[in-house]
Amino acid sequence: MEVVQINTPIAVMFVVYALLMLYIGFYFYKQNKNSEDYFLGGRTMGPVISALSAGASDMSGWLLMGLPGALYVSGFIDSYIAIGLTIGASLNWIFVAKRLRIYTSVIANSLTIPDYFETRFDDDKHILRIVCAVVILIFFTFYVSSGLVSGAKLFESTFGIRYDYALTTGTIIIVAYTFLGGYKAVCWTDMIQGLLMMMALIIVPLVMLYHLGGFGEAMNIVREIKPQALSMGEGVGIISIISALAWGLGYFGQPHILVRFMSIRSTKDIPMATFIGIAWMAVCLLSACMIGILGIAYVHKFELSLQDPEKIFIVMSQLLFNPWIAGILLSAILAAIMSTASSQLLVSSSTIAEDFYKKIFREDVPSHIVLNLGKLGVLLVAVIAFLISTDKNSSVLSIVSYAWAGFGASFGSVMFFSLFWSRMTRVGAILGMITGAATVVLWKNFANSGLYEIVPGFLVASVVIIIASLFTNVRSGTKAAYEKMLKEL
């Protein structure tokens, strides 16, 4: 039976967890004195909080639902996604984190990614900022909706309630503590949620192995009923492997992850944060992959019915553990959803308040008004994402992959070149961003090649950046700022 009936212990653990997150939001509510506090936490985040916050905000409900579900359906071939993500995240921490932290604080006090791009390319016309803001609002609205779908599936499966009621409940919880607490609340809850996610992902596959009779026995069952699931290459085309590995390219352009680099206390904290972040990620991704593979064996051995593969973690948590423990483990999904959705809502709100209203329409606006506009932005994006999420048949992985590709192609290419090529120009950045986003949208909707849209999007954007930059002039001051950044490394 896929859905376990609602019981008091699981309900109590969910309520306790949700109240804890809301308390953290209330606690930091009065500490937000200005927009920099609300959007970047005053740049006071230490290495542990920065690393776990980056990881938790990155992974979302996809880590506990989308990825195990993908491996349950397709087998180890989809583990290339995890490999690509680990490589991409490592490169992001090693090559991007320090340069971005220096640029956004030493060169100019940039609070948002559009802030950074405008300063980096001396864009006094605000064209780049507007393009950035539009891309962020479009793709983050889809990204937030994936989190809301995950939350709705969680509540629906756990409590047996209707999808629309489940969707409404999850949305209210996520919006409430983001609305109140701002960046510090998001980072502190991310740290707690990151630890909870890792604990759950380690415990569940270990208990599954115990019930299956060990790793060898589990693999024998999988080999007997679905041998192709254990192959990472047999019968799989190179296009599929490239597409899976290409997920790593997306890291260079994810605003909700990049702001973690901007808010870290000091560049001296980055090496430790890098180690913690990558170690956390490797453990979580490996464990999530194993849940999917072991799920194949468990469902077959115990003759279970699983209509939705993305619920394999939920079903295993309900079946294998005492209801009180199951409540804690299932709270890990809520943690993953809340950590990512709240970070994305915060970036979206800063885009509306800082990048649209303050920078374009009224630069002398008082900080407390920017703060309030940011909170209204949280509500606006959440409402639109809620409407997108009303289709209960939506795939979490499909929605995430689209938004991930959009940011990776449009922002990722521009971010990478902006930090490593002093000759890059404002025109190159604008055209690269537009063509990257447009290529993703067109490829997703009209191409049937099987190639993940981030690959052509990133490549086209990179070519456009190089050509446009070589045929246009670098604006005065940008080279000097670039050289200043290099001296600070």
Language model feature labels by segment:
Residues M1-L489:
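Membrane-embedded helix-loop-helix hairpins and adjacent transmembrane boundary segments
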